């Protein structure tokens, strides 16, 4: 059984598992798969060809563009933006912002990024396109140059 809020919109080929909670004004594109036990809060937009595996929480105001994959246990905090073709490994987290309500996106993950499993991205950090983080990395600053980043805190590997 799922709980789906008001004004929910989905494209064709939308699939949803069991025991999900979807808030009001959520828009989901074509060929989207939402696994089991996901929580999607109000005013979230999800593009086409997106997979949310399961046990995922997406906070209000978040936008996920096309061709993204979020593995089990991913948590996206308020107003996060995932650009096209982002992969979030299992149990990755974007950490929350400030107490102030913002209308612009806080944490931004650029196109073609791969976030390794268990990684954390600090509040309101921005990753440019084509960034890879190793598993269990902690992103505590903006990343403005494409490359591979690892460690706590992250440092550029190459």
Predicted regions and their residues:
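C-terminal substrate-recognition "lid" of short-chain dehydrogenase/reductases
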Residues: 125-127, 142-145
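Short helix N-cap motif at coil->helix boundaries in the Bergerat
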Residues: 141, 158
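Acidic, glycine-centered active-site loop in nucleotide-sugar glycosyltransferases
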Residues: 144-145, 150-153
């Amino acid at each position: 059984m799922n709980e789906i809020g008001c004004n929910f919109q989905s494209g064709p080929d939308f699939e949803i598992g069991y025991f999900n909670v979807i808030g009001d004004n959520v828009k989901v594109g074509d060929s989207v798969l939402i696994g089991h036990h996901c929580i999607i809060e109000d005013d979230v937009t999800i593009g086409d060809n997106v997979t949310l595996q399961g046990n995922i929480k997406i906070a209000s105001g978040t936008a996920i563009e096309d061709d993204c994959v979020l593995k089990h246990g991913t948590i996206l905090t308020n107003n996060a933006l995932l650009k096209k073709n982002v992969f979030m490994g299992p149990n990755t987290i974007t950490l929350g912002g400030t107490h102030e309500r913002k209308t612009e996106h806080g944490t931004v993950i650029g196109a073609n990024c791969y976030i390794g499993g268990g990684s954390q991205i600090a509040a309101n950090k921005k990753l440019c396109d084509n960034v890879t983080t190793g598993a269990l990395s902690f992103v505590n600053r903006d990343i403005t140059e494409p490359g591979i980043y690892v460690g706590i805190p992250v440092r550029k590997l190459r």
